[in-house]
Protein backbone atom coordinates (compact mmCIF):
# COMPACT_ATOMS: atom_id res chain seq x y z
CA UNK A 1 0.00 0.00 0.00
CA UNK A 2 1.45 3.40 -0.95
CA UNK A 3 1.64 6.16 1.66
CA UNK A 4 -1.23 8.24 0.26
CA UNK A 5 -3.55 5.23 0.30
CA UNK A 6 -2.40 4.38 3.83
CA UNK A 7 -3.16 7.91 5.07
CA UNK A 8 -6.51 8.02 3.25
CA UNK A 9 -7.53 4.68 4.80
CA UNK A 10 -6.55 5.82 8.32
CA UNK A 11 -8.52 9.08 7.95
CA UNK A 12 -11.52 7.17 6.53
CA UNK A 13 -11.66 5.10 9.74
CA UNK A 14 -12.38 8.24 11.79
CA UNK A 15 -14.28 10.23 9.10
CA UNK A 16 -17.17 8.05 7.88
CA UNK A 17 -18.67 11.14 6.20
CA UNK A 18 -16.07 10.97 3.38
CA UNK A 19 -15.23 8.15 0.96
CA UNK A 20 -11.61 6.99 0.98
CA UNK A 21 -11.16 8.01 -2.68
CA UNK A 22 -12.38 11.53 -1.89
CA UNK A 23 -9.92 11.76 1.02
CA UNK A 24 -7.12 10.49 -1.24
CA UNK A 25 -7.82 13.24 -3.77
CA UNK A 26 -7.85 15.94 -1.06
CA UNK A 27 -4.41 15.06 0.32
CA UNK A 28 -1.76 17.70 -0.31
CA UNK A 29 2.03 17.84 -0.17
CA UNK A 30 3.10 20.70 2.15
CA UNK A 31 5.37 23.31 0.56
CA UNK A 32 7.78 22.98 3.48
CA UNK A 33 8.92 19.49 4.55
CA UNK A 34 9.02 20.76 8.17
CA UNK A 35 5.21 20.70 7.95
CA UNK A 36 5.15 16.97 7.23
CA UNK A 37 5.08 14.70 4.19
CA UNK A 38 1.35 14.89 3.45
CA UNK A 39 -1.49 17.01 4.77
CA UNK A 40 -5.27 16.70 4.88
CA UNK A 41 -7.27 19.97 4.77
CA UNK A 42 -10.31 19.86 7.07
CA UNK A 43 -12.25 22.58 5.19
CA UNK A 44 -14.29 19.99 3.27
CA UNK A 45 -15.74 18.68 6.56
CA UNK A 46 -16.75 22.05 8.03
CA UNK A 47 -20.26 22.04 6.53
CA UNK A 48 -20.93 18.38 7.27
CA UNK A 49 -19.68 18.45 10.87
CA UNK A 50 -20.75 22.07 11.53
CA UNK A 51 -17.47 22.92 13.20
CA UNK A 52 -14.55 25.18 12.43
CA UNK A 53 -11.86 23.46 10.29
CA UNK A 54 -9.22 24.12 12.99
CA UNK A 55 -11.32 22.29 15.61
CA UNK A 56 -12.02 19.39 13.22
CA UNK A 57 -8.29 19.01 12.44
CA UNK A 58 -7.39 19.05 16.13
CA UNK A 59 -10.02 16.45 17.08
CA UNK A 60 -9.24 14.09 14.19
CA UNK A 61 -5.48 14.25 14.78
CA UNK A 62 -6.14 12.88 18.28
CA UNK A 63 -8.25 9.99 16.93
CA UNK A 64 -5.97 8.79 14.11
CA UNK A 65 -3.82 5.73 14.85
CA UNK A 66 -0.26 7.09 14.98
CA UNK A 67 1.45 3.70 15.01
CA UNK A 68 1.84 3.76 11.21
CA UNK A 69 3.51 7.18 11.23
CA UNK A 70 6.35 9.07 12.87
CA UNK A 71 3.76 11.55 14.14
CA UNK A 72 0.40 13.12 13.26
CA UNK A 73 -0.17 16.77 14.24
CA UNK A 74 -2.87 19.37 13.67
CA UNK A 75 -1.61 22.73 12.39
CA UNK A 76 -4.48 25.17 11.93
CA UNK A 77 -7.07 23.60 9.60
CA UNK A 78 -4.64 20.88 8.43
CA UNK A 79 -3.76 17.43 9.74
CA UNK A 80 -0.07 16.95 8.95
CA UNK A 81 1.38 13.46 8.60
CA UNK A 82 5.07 12.75 9.20
CA UNK A 83 5.97 9.38 7.73
CA UNK A 84 8.27 6.84 9.33
CA UNK A 85 10.81 6.98 6.49
CA UNK A 86 13.11 4.25 7.81
CA UNK A 87 10.21 1.82 8.20
CA UNK A 88 8.67 2.61 4.81
CA UNK A 89 12.01 2.48 2.96
CA UNK A 90 12.68 -0.91 4.52
CA UNK A 91 9.30 -2.23 3.34
CA UNK A 92 9.69 -0.83 -0.19
CA UNK A 93 13.24 -2.15 -0.64
CA UNK A 94 12.21 -5.58 0.64
CA UNK A 95 9.29 -5.70 -1.82
CA UNK A 96 11.48 -4.81 -4.83
CA UNK A 97 14.37 -7.11 -3.84
CA UNK A 98 11.98 -10.04 -3.27
CA UNK A 99 9.85 -9.54 -6.40
CA UNK A 100 12.50 -8.30 -8.84
CA UNK A 101 10.97 -7.45 -12.23
CA UNK A 102 7.60 -8.74 -10.93
CA UNK A 103 7.43 -5.79 -8.51
CA UNK A 104 4.13 -3.92 -9.03
CA UNK A 105 2.57 -6.83 -10.97
CA UNK A 106 -1.22 -6.53 -10.59
CA UNK A 107 -4.21 -8.81 -11.14
CA UNK A 108 -6.95 -6.45 -12.28
CA UNK A 109 -7.25 -8.28 -15.63
CA UNK A 110 -7.44 -11.81 -14.17
CA UNK A 111 -6.13 -13.18 -17.46
CA UNK A 112 -8.89 -11.65 -19.60
CA UNK A 113 -8.10 -10.56 -23.17
CA UNK A 114 -7.53 -7.01 -24.40
CA UNK A 115 -7.70 -6.66 -28.19
CA UNK A 116 -5.33 -3.93 -29.41
CA UNK A 117 -5.80 -2.67 -32.97
CA UNK A 118 -2.42 -1.06 -33.70
CA UNK A 119 0.15 -0.12 -36.34
CA UNK A 120 -2.01 -1.10 -39.34
CA UNK A 121 0.08 0.33 -42.20
CA UNK A 122 -1.22 0.42 -45.74
CA UNK A 123 0.06 -2.27 -48.08
CA UNK A 124 2.25 -1.02 -50.94
CA UNK A 125 3.03 2.19 -49.08
CA UNK A 126 6.17 2.81 -47.04
CA UNK A 127 6.17 2.43 -43.28
CA UNK A 128 6.62 6.03 -42.29
CA UNK A 129 7.12 7.85 -39.00
CA UNK A 130 3.38 8.59 -39.15
CA UNK A 131 2.70 4.87 -38.52
CA UNK A 132 5.19 4.80 -35.68
CA UNK A 133 2.86 6.40 -33.13
CA UNK A 134 0.19 3.71 -33.43
CA UNK A 135 2.87 1.01 -33.32
CA UNK A 136 4.77 2.19 -30.23
CA UNK A 137 1.71 3.39 -28.27
CA UNK A 138 -0.01 0.05 -28.93
CA UNK A 139 3.07 -1.99 -28.06
CA UNK A 140 3.60 -0.09 -24.80
CA UNK A 141 -0.07 -0.47 -23.84
CA UNK A 142 0.22 -4.23 -24.49
CA UNK A 143 3.04 -4.42 -21.91
CA UNK A 144 1.09 -2.22 -19.48
CA UNK A 145 -2.08 -4.33 -19.79
CA UNK A 146 -0.03 -7.50 -19.20
CA UNK A 147 1.43 -5.88 -16.07
CA UNK A 148 -2.18 -5.23 -14.96
CA UNK A 149 -2.98 -8.94 -15.35
CA UNK A 150 -4.65 -8.86 -18.77
CA UNK A 151 -3.65 -10.90 -21.83
CA UNK A 152 -2.98 -8.50 -24.71
CA UNK A 153 -3.89 -9.58 -28.25
CA UNK A 154 -2.00 -7.36 -30.70
CA UNK A 155 -3.82 -7.02 -34.02
CA UNK A 156 -2.18 -5.50 -37.09
CA UNK A 157 -5.30 -4.52 -39.05
CA UNK A 158 -3.45 -4.12 -42.35
CA UNK A 159 -4.75 -1.62 -44.90
CA UNK A 160 -4.80 -4.27 -47.61
CA UNK A 161 -8.02 -3.33 -49.40
CA UNK A 162 -9.58 -0.27 -51.00
CA UNK A 163 -9.56 2.06 -53.98
CA UNK A 164 -5.83 2.73 -53.57
CA UNK A 165 -5.21 -0.75 -55.01
CA UNK A 166 -7.12 0.28 -58.10
CA UNK A 167 -4.81 3.31 -58.35
CA UNK A 168 -1.73 1.16 -57.87
CA UNK A 169 -2.79 -1.41 -60.48
CA UNK A 170 -3.40 1.41 -63.00
CA UNK A 171 0.03 2.90 -62.22
CA UNK A 172 1.82 -0.45 -62.43
CA UNK A 173 0.18 -1.33 -65.76
CA UNK A 174 1.17 2.10 -67.14
CA UNK A 175 4.74 2.43 -65.89
CA UNK A 176 5.62 -0.60 -63.75
CA UNK A 177 8.88 -2.51 -64.06
CA UNK A 178 8.68 -5.96 -62.46
CA UNK A 179 12.44 -6.25 -61.88
CA UNK A 180 12.61 -2.80 -60.27
CA UNK A 181 9.67 -3.59 -57.96
CA UNK A 182 11.22 -6.91 -56.94
CA UNK A 183 14.55 -5.22 -56.20
CA UNK A 184 13.10 -2.32 -54.17
CA UNK A 185 9.39 -3.06 -53.67
CA UNK A 186 8.25 -0.25 -51.38
CA UNK A 187 10.39 2.45 -53.02
CA UNK A 188 9.12 1.58 -56.48
CA UNK A 189 5.49 1.18 -55.40
CA UNK A 190 5.65 4.54 -53.61
CA UNK A 191 6.98 6.23 -56.76
CA UNK A 192 4.13 4.70 -58.76
CA UNK A 193 1.55 5.73 -56.14
CA UNK A 194 2.75 9.35 -55.97
CA UNK A 195 2.96 9.58 -59.78
CA UNK A 196 -0.57 8.24 -60.37
CA UNK A 197 -2.05 10.57 -57.73
CA UNK A 198 -0.34 13.55 -59.35
CA UNK A 199 -1.79 12.53 -62.72
CA UNK A 200 -5.26 12.03 -61.18
CA UNK A 201 -5.30 15.68 -60.08
CA UNK A 202 -5.36 16.80 -63.73
CA UNK A 203 -6.95 13.76 -65.41
CA UNK A 204 -10.37 12.65 -64.04
CA UNK A 205 -10.29 9.43 -66.09
CA UNK A 206 -7.56 8.05 -63.79
CA UNK A 207 -10.02 7.86 -60.89
CA UNK A 208 -12.60 6.10 -63.07
CA UNK A 209 -10.02 3.58 -64.28
CA UNK A 210 -8.86 2.94 -60.70
CA UNK A 211 -12.43 2.38 -59.54
CA UNK A 212 -12.93 -0.09 -62.39
CA UNK A 213 -9.81 -2.07 -61.45
CA UNK A 214 -10.87 -2.13 -57.82
CA UNK A 215 -14.29 -3.47 -58.88
CA UNK A 216 -12.48 -6.23 -60.78
CA UNK A 217 -10.47 -6.98 -57.65
CA UNK A 218 -13.69 -7.21 -55.59
CA UNK A 219 -15.14 -9.57 -58.21
CA UNK A 220 -12.09 -11.87 -58.01
CA UNK A 221 -10.57 -11.01 -61.41
CA UNK A 222 -7.43 -13.17 -61.85
CA UNK A 223 -5.00 -10.44 -62.98
CA UNK A 224 -6.19 -7.93 -60.37
CA UNK A 225 -6.04 -10.53 -57.58
CA UNK A 226 -2.53 -11.70 -58.52
CA UNK A 227 -1.20 -8.12 -58.58
CA UNK A 228 -2.89 -7.36 -55.24
CA UNK A 229 -1.43 -10.50 -53.65
CA UNK A 230 2.04 -9.62 -54.96
CA UNK A 231 1.86 -6.05 -53.63
CA UNK A 232 0.71 -7.44 -50.25
CA UNK A 233 3.41 -10.13 -50.00
CA UNK A 234 6.26 -7.75 -50.92
CA UNK A 235 5.02 -5.10 -48.49
CA UNK A 236 4.65 -7.55 -45.61
CA UNK A 237 8.22 -8.79 -46.06
CA UNK A 238 9.44 -5.21 -45.74
CA UNK A 239 7.15 -4.39 -42.79
CA UNK A 240 8.26 -7.48 -40.87
CA UNK A 241 11.90 -6.52 -41.30
CA UNK A 242 11.07 -3.14 -39.72
CA UNK A 243 9.01 -4.72 -36.93
CA UNK A 244 12.01 -6.95 -36.15
CA UNK A 245 14.17 -3.83 -35.81
CA UNK A 246 11.62 -2.29 -33.47
CA UNK A 247 11.23 -5.58 -31.52
CA UNK A 248 7.46 -5.47 -32.11
CA UNK A 249 5.42 -8.64 -32.67
CA UNK A 250 1.75 -9.30 -33.43
CA UNK A 251 -0.79 -11.99 -32.67
CA UNK A 252 -2.85 -11.34 -35.81
CA UNK A 253 -2.30 -9.80 -39.25
CA UNK A 254 -5.98 -9.98 -40.19
CA UNK A 255 -6.43 -6.86 -42.28
CA UNK A 256 -9.29 -5.27 -44.18
CA UNK A 257 -9.40 -8.00 -46.84
CA UNK A 258 -9.95 -10.67 -44.16
CA UNK A 259 -13.43 -9.24 -43.53
CA UNK A 260 -14.58 -9.24 -47.18
CA UNK A 261 -16.75 -12.33 -46.61
CA UNK A 262 -17.96 -11.22 -43.18
CA UNK A 263 -19.81 -8.02 -44.08
CA UNK A 264 -22.97 -9.60 -45.44
CA UNK A 265 -23.73 -10.85 -41.92
CA UNK A 266 -23.47 -7.26 -40.64
CA UNK A 267 -25.93 -6.07 -43.30
CA UNK A 268 -28.30 -8.96 -42.47
CA UNK A 269 -28.17 -8.13 -38.73
CA UNK A 270 -28.82 -4.44 -39.37
CA UNK A 271 -31.76 -5.30 -41.62
CA UNK A 272 -33.17 -7.82 -39.13
CA UNK A 273 -33.12 -5.14 -36.43
CA UNK A 274 -34.73 -2.60 -38.83
CA UNK A 275 -31.83 -0.19 -38.35
CA UNK A 276 -31.08 0.51 -42.02
CA UNK A 277 -32.69 3.61 -43.49
CA UNK A 278 -32.51 4.68 -47.14
CA UNK A 279 -30.96 8.09 -47.76
CA UNK A 280 -30.32 9.30 -51.33
CA UNK A 281 -30.10 5.70 -52.49
CA UNK A 282 -27.62 4.76 -49.76
CA UNK A 283 -28.21 2.66 -46.63
CA UNK A 284 -27.54 4.49 -43.34
CA UNK A 285 -28.10 4.11 -39.58
CA UNK A 286 -29.42 7.19 -37.78
CA UNK A 287 -27.55 7.98 -34.56
CA UNK A 288 -29.13 11.26 -33.45
CA UNK A 289 -30.17 9.81 -30.08
CA UNK A 290 -26.45 9.36 -29.31
CA UNK A 291 -25.80 13.03 -30.07
CA UNK A 292 -24.21 12.12 -33.43
CA UNK A 293 -25.52 14.43 -36.14
CA UNK A 294 -24.36 12.51 -39.21
CA UNK A 295 -25.81 9.03 -39.83
CA UNK A 296 -23.45 6.09 -40.29
CA UNK A 297 -23.14 5.37 -44.01
CA UNK A 298 -23.23 1.57 -44.27
CA UNK A 299 -23.69 0.98 -48.00
CA UNK A 300 -23.34 3.44 -50.87
CA UNK A 301 -25.92 3.82 -53.63
CA UNK A 302 -23.71 1.77 -55.99
CA UNK A 303 -23.78 -1.13 -53.50
CA UNK A 304 -20.22 -0.63 -52.25
CA UNK A 305 -19.67 -1.13 -48.53
CA UNK A 306 -17.66 1.30 -46.42
CA UNK A 307 -14.97 1.24 -43.74
CA UNK A 308 -17.56 1.26 -40.96
CA UNK A 309 -19.23 -1.88 -42.34
CA UNK A 310 -15.85 -3.62 -42.32
CA UNK A 311 -15.07 -2.34 -38.80
CA UNK A 312 -18.46 -3.60 -37.57
CA UNK A 313 -17.59 -7.04 -38.97
CA UNK A 314 -14.15 -6.84 -37.31
CA UNK A 315 -15.64 -5.85 -33.93
CA UNK A 316 -18.08 -8.80 -34.03
CA UNK A 317 -15.31 -11.21 -35.08
CA UNK A 318 -12.98 -10.01 -32.31
CA UNK A 319 -15.64 -10.29 -29.61
CA UNK A 320 -16.48 -13.83 -30.69
CA UNK A 321 -12.85 -14.87 -31.11
CA UNK A 322 -11.25 -13.20 -28.08
CA UNK A 323 -14.22 -12.39 -25.79
CA UNK A 324 -12.29 -9.25 -24.89
CA UNK A 325 -12.60 -7.35 -21.61
CA UNK A 326 -11.41 -4.29 -23.54
CA UNK A 327 -11.00 -3.56 -27.22
CA UNK A 328 -8.60 -0.73 -27.97
CA UNK A 329 -8.11 1.09 -31.29
CA UNK A 330 -4.81 2.98 -31.44
CA UNK A 331 -5.66 5.25 -34.36
CA UNK A 332 -5.08 8.94 -35.12
CA UNK A 333 -7.36 11.60 -33.67
CA UNK A 334 -8.72 12.43 -37.15
CA UNK A 335 -10.77 9.20 -36.92
CA UNK A 336 -12.61 10.26 -33.74
CA UNK A 337 -15.99 10.71 -35.47
CA UNK A 338 -15.68 7.29 -37.15
CA UNK A 339 -15.15 5.47 -33.84
CA UNK A 340 -18.03 7.32 -32.17
CA UNK A 341 -20.27 6.09 -34.99
CA UNK A 342 -18.86 2.55 -34.76
CA UNK A 343 -19.63 2.26 -31.04
CA UNK A 344 -23.07 3.83 -31.46
CA UNK A 345 -24.09 1.45 -34.28
CA UNK A 346 -23.01 -1.56 -32.18
CA UNK A 347 -25.00 -0.14 -29.26
CA UNK A 348 -28.05 0.19 -31.54
CA UNK A 349 -27.56 -3.44 -32.55
CA UNK A 350 -27.92 -4.37 -28.87
CA UNK A 351 -24.26 -5.08 -28.13
CA UNK A 352 -23.57 -3.56 -24.72
CA UNK A 353 -19.96 -4.77 -24.95
CA UNK A 354 -19.42 -1.78 -27.24
CA UNK A 355 -18.92 0.12 -23.94
CA UNK A 356 -15.67 -1.86 -23.58
CA UNK A 357 -14.30 -0.37 -26.83
CA UNK A 358 -11.98 2.63 -26.63
CA UNK A 359 -10.51 4.81 -29.36
CA UNK A 360 -6.99 5.59 -28.13
CA UNK A 361 -6.47 8.67 -30.28
CA UNK A 362 -3.20 10.52 -30.85
CA UNK A 363 -1.92 13.71 -32.46
CA UNK A 364 0.10 14.16 -35.62
CA UNK A 365 3.84 13.89 -36.16
CA UNK A 366 5.11 16.84 -38.20
CA UNK A 367 8.47 17.71 -39.74
CA UNK A 368 9.48 21.35 -39.59
CA UNK A 369 5.87 22.09 -38.64
CA UNK A 370 4.51 20.55 -41.88
CA UNK A 371 2.05 17.64 -41.98
CA UNK A 372 3.36 14.40 -43.47
CA UNK A 373 1.60 12.98 -46.55
CA UNK A 374 2.33 9.76 -48.47
CA UNK A 375 0.20 10.92 -51.38
CA UNK A 376 2.33 14.04 -51.85
CA UNK A 377 5.59 12.22 -51.19
CA UNK A 378 6.25 14.24 -48.01
CA UNK A 379 7.20 11.38 -45.69
CA UNK A 380 9.89 10.47 -43.17
CA UNK A 381 10.63 6.83 -43.88
CA UNK A 382 11.22 4.73 -40.79
CA UNK A 383 14.00 2.44 -42.05
CA UNK A 384 16.61 5.12 -42.91
CA UNK A 385 15.56 7.09 -39.82
CA UNK A 386 16.19 4.11 -37.52
CA UNK A 387 19.55 3.54 -39.21
CA UNK A 388 20.53 7.17 -38.64
CA UNK A 389 19.40 7.04 -34.99
CA UNK A 390 21.56 3.93 -34.43
CA UNK A 391 24.55 5.64 -36.09
CA UNK A 392 24.13 8.75 -33.92
CA UNK A 393 23.89 6.58 -30.81
CA UNK A 394 27.01 4.66 -31.90
CA UNK A 395 28.97 7.91 -32.29
CA UNK A 396 28.05 9.05 -28.77
CA UNK A 397 28.84 5.64 -27.27
CA UNK A 398 32.23 5.63 -29.06
CA UNK A 399 33.02 9.05 -27.55
CA UNK A 400 31.88 8.09 -24.03
CA UNK A 401 33.05 4.48 -23.81
CA UNK A 402 35.32 3.39 -26.72
CA UNK A 403 36.16 0.06 -25.03
CA UNK A 404 32.52 -0.99 -24.58
CA UNK A 405 31.83 -4.61 -25.52
CA UNK A 406 28.99 -5.33 -27.96
CA UNK A 407 28.82 -1.69 -29.10
CA UNK A 408 26.60 -2.54 -32.08
CA UNK A 409 23.84 -4.11 -29.95
CA UNK A 410 23.96 -1.25 -27.44
CA UNK A 411 23.80 1.36 -30.23
CA UNK A 412 20.73 -0.43 -31.63
CA UNK A 413 19.04 -0.46 -28.20
CA UNK A 414 19.82 3.23 -27.66
CA UNK A 415 18.91 4.42 -31.18
CA UNK A 416 15.63 2.52 -31.45
CA UNK A 417 14.80 3.24 -27.80
CA UNK A 418 15.40 6.95 -28.38
CA UNK A 419 12.80 7.13 -31.17
CA UNK A 420 10.22 5.14 -29.18
CA UNK A 421 10.76 7.04 -25.92
CA UNK A 422 10.51 10.48 -27.55
CA UNK A 423 7.17 9.51 -29.06
CA UNK A 424 5.83 7.98 -25.84
CA UNK A 425 6.87 10.82 -23.52
CA UNK A 426 4.55 13.13 -25.50
CA UNK A 427 0.95 13.20 -24.23
CA UNK A 428 -0.64 11.12 -26.96
CA UNK A 429 -3.33 13.69 -27.82
CA UNK A 430 -0.55 16.17 -28.60
CA UNK A 431 1.48 15.96 -31.76
CA UNK A 432 5.21 16.55 -31.91
CA UNK A 433 7.76 17.75 -34.42
CA UNK A 434 10.20 15.03 -35.46
CA UNK A 435 13.72 15.98 -34.34
CA UNK A 436 16.21 13.11 -34.44
CA UNK A 437 19.03 15.11 -32.83
CA UNK A 438 16.87 15.88 -29.79
CA UNK A 439 15.67 12.26 -29.59
CA UNK A 440 19.13 10.68 -29.46
CA UNK A 441 20.61 13.21 -27.01
CA UNK A 442 22.00 11.80 -23.74
CA UNK A 443 20.90 15.03 -22.02
CA UNK A 444 17.38 16.20 -21.19
CA UNK A 445 14.16 14.23 -21.04
CA UNK A 446 15.16 11.48 -23.46
CA UNK A 447 15.36 7.71 -23.68
CA UNK A 448 19.19 7.66 -23.71
CA UNK A 449 19.20 9.80 -20.53
CA UNK A 450 17.06 7.22 -18.70
CA UNK A 451 19.01 4.28 -20.18
CA UNK A 452 22.29 5.90 -19.10
CA UNK A 453 21.03 6.32 -15.52
CA UNK A 454 20.24 2.59 -15.46
CA UNK A 455 23.66 1.68 -16.91
CA UNK A 456 25.37 3.95 -14.37
CA UNK A 457 23.66 2.11 -11.49
CA UNK A 458 24.65 -1.27 -12.94
CA UNK A 459 28.25 -0.02 -13.08
CA UNK A 460 28.09 0.97 -9.38
CA UNK A 461 26.69 -2.46 -8.44
CA UNK A 462 29.42 -4.25 -10.44
CA UNK A 463 32.13 -2.10 -8.85
CA UNK A 464 30.77 -2.87 -5.37
CA UNK A 465 30.20 -6.54 -6.27
CA UNK A 466 26.85 -6.14 -4.53
CA UNK A 467 23.83 -8.43 -4.66
CA UNK A 468 21.09 -7.71 -2.10
CA UNK A 469 19.88 -10.41 0.26
CA UNK A 470 16.15 -11.02 0.70
CA UNK A 471 16.80 -11.84 4.37
CA UNK A 472 18.64 -8.59 5.17
CA UNK A 473 16.76 -5.50 6.34
CA UNK A 474 17.81 -2.36 4.48
CA UNK A 475 16.50 1.08 5.39
CA UNK A 476 17.27 4.74 4.74
CA UNK A 477 15.78 7.94 6.14
CA UNK A 478 17.80 10.76 4.51
CA UNK A 479 16.03 13.30 2.28
CA UNK A 480 17.74 12.32 -1.02
CA UNK A 481 16.99 8.61 -0.55
CA UNK A 482 13.41 9.40 0.44
CA UNK A 483 12.73 11.14 -2.90
CA UNK A 484 13.69 7.91 -4.70
CA UNK A 485 11.80 5.65 -2.27
CA UNK A 486 8.60 7.67 -2.79
CA UNK A 487 8.87 7.22 -6.56
CA UNK A 488 9.56 3.48 -6.32
CA UNK A 489 6.63 3.09 -3.92
CA UNK A 490 4.42 4.97 -6.39
CA UNK A 491 5.29 2.64 -9.31
CA UNK A 492 2.19 0.38 -8.94
CA UNK A 493 -0.09 3.43 -8.99
CA UNK A 494 1.74 4.83 -12.04
CA UNK A 495 1.13 1.55 -13.89
CA UNK A 496 -2.58 1.66 -13.00
CA UNK A 497 -2.89 5.32 -14.08
CA UNK A 498 -1.13 4.54 -17.37
CA UNK A 499 -3.52 1.65 -17.97
CA UNK A 500 -6.70 3.50 -16.93
CA UNK A 501 -5.87 6.49 -19.12
CA UNK A 502 -4.35 4.54 -22.04
CA UNK A 503 -1.50 7.04 -21.66
CA UNK A 504 2.11 5.76 -21.90
CA UNK A 505 3.43 9.31 -21.38
CA UNK A 506 2.58 8.88 -17.66
CA UNK A 507 5.07 5.98 -17.52
CA UNK A 508 7.68 7.82 -19.60
CA UNK A 509 7.52 10.87 -17.32
CA UNK A 510 7.84 8.59 -14.29
CA UNK A 511 10.99 7.04 -15.79
CA UNK A 512 12.45 10.52 -16.37
CA UNK A 513 11.64 11.57 -12.78
CA UNK A 514 13.22 8.44 -11.33
CA UNK A 515 16.37 8.84 -13.47
CA UNK A 516 16.64 12.52 -12.50
CA UNK A 517 16.16 11.72 -8.80
CA UNK A 518 18.85 9.06 -8.93
CA UNK A 519 21.30 11.34 -10.76
CA UNK A 520 20.74 14.00 -8.09
CA UNK A 521 21.32 11.36 -5.40
CA UNK A 522 24.48 10.17 -7.18
CA UNK A 523 25.83 13.74 -7.32
CA UNK A 524 25.32 14.35 -3.58
CA UNK A 525 25.98 10.93 -2.04
CA UNK A 526 29.20 8.97 -1.69
CA UNK A 527 27.49 5.66 -2.39
CA UNK A 528 30.58 3.44 -2.18
CA UNK A 529 32.04 4.94 1.01
CA UNK A 530 32.77 2.05 3.36
CA UNK A 531 30.54 2.87 6.31
CA UNK A 532 27.39 1.54 8.01
CA UNK A 533 25.11 3.01 5.28
CA UNK A 534 26.94 1.47 2.30
CA UNK A 535 24.77 -1.64 1.89
CA UNK A 536 21.59 0.38 2.45
CA UNK A 537 22.63 2.79 -0.31
CA UNK A 538 23.54 -0.09 -2.64
CA UNK A 539 20.17 -1.75 -1.95
CA UNK A 540 18.53 1.52 -2.98
CA UNK A 541 20.63 1.52 -6.17
CA UNK A 542 19.56 -2.06 -6.90
CA UNK A 543 15.87 -1.24 -6.39
CA UNK A 544 16.14 1.89 -8.55
CA UNK A 545 17.77 -0.04 -11.40
CA UNK A 546 15.11 -2.78 -11.14
CA UNK A 547 12.25 -0.28 -11.41
CA UNK A 548 13.95 1.83 -14.11
CA UNK A 549 14.51 -1.27 -16.25
CA UNK A 550 10.90 -2.37 -15.77
CA UNK A 551 9.55 1.12 -16.56
CA UNK A 552 11.57 1.12 -19.79
CA UNK A 553 10.36 -2.41 -20.63
CA UNK A 554 6.77 -1.23 -20.23
CA UNK A 555 7.60 1.41 -22.84
CA UNK A 556 9.11 -1.35 -25.03
CA UNK A 557 12.58 0.19 -24.60
CA UNK A 558 15.65 -1.93 -23.77
CA UNK A 559 17.89 -1.07 -20.80
CA UNK A 560 21.53 -1.98 -21.54
CA UNK A 561 23.70 -2.78 -18.51
CA UNK A 562 26.61 -0.85 -20.03
CA UNK A 563 26.69 2.17 -22.31
From Swiss-Prot:
Name by which UniProt lists this protein: Arginine--tRNA ligase
SUPFAM superfamilies: Anticodon-binding domain of a subclass of class I aminoacyl-tRNA synthetases, Arginyl-tRNA synthetase (ArgRS), N-terminal 'additional' domain, Nucleotidylyl transferase
Coiled coil keyword on record: no
S-S bridge residues: none
Taxonomic lineage of the native organism: Bacteria, Bacillati, Bacillota, Bacilli, Lactobacillales
Enzyme Commission number(s): 6.1.1.19
Species name: Streptococcus pyogenes serotype M12 (strain MGAS2096)
Residue interval(s) of motif 'HIGH' region: 121-131
Coiled coil: none
Catalytic reactions on record: tRNA(Arg) + L-arginine + ATP = L-arginyl-tRNA(Arg) + AMP + diphosphate
Matches recorded under CDD domains: Anticodon_Ia_Arg, ArgRS_core
Entry keyword set: Aminoacyl-tRNA synthetase, ATP-binding, Cytoplasm, Ligase, Nucleotide-binding, Protein biosynthesis
Principal subcellular localisation of the protein: cytoplasm
Family statement: Belongs to the class-I aminoacyl-tRNA synthetase family.
Single GO MF descriptor: arginine-tRNA ligase activity
InterPro entries attached to this UniProt entry: Arg-tRNA-ligase (IPR001278), Arg-tRNA-synth_N (IPR005148), Arg-tRNA-synth_N_sf (IPR036695), ArgRS_core (IPR035684), DALR_anticod-bd (IPR008909), Rossmann-like_a/b/a_fold (IPR014729), tRNAsynth_Ia_anticodon-bd (IPR009080)
Enzyme class: ligase
Pfam family, one: tRNA-synt_1d
Compartments it resides in: Cytoplasm
Entry GO terms, CC: cytoplasm
Record GO biological process: arginyl-tRNA aminoacylation
Statement: the UniProt record of this protein carries the keyword Secreted: no
Summary of subunit composition and partner proteins: Monomer.
Amino acid sequence: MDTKTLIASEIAKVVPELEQDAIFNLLETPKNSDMGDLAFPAFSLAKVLRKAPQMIASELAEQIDESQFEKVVAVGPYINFFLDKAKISSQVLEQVITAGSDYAQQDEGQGRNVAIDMSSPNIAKPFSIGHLRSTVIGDSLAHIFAKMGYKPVKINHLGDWGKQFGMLIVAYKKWGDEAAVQAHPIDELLKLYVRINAEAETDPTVDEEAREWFRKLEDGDKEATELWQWFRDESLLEFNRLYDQLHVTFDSYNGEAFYNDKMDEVLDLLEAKNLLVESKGAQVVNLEKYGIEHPALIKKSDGATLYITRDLAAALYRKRTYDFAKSVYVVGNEQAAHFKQLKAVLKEMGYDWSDDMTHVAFGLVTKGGAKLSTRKGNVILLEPTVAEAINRAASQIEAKNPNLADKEAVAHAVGVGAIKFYDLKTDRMNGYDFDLEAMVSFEGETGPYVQYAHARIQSILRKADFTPSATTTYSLADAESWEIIKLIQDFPRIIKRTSDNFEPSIMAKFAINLAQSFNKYYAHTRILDDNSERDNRLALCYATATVLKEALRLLSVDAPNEM
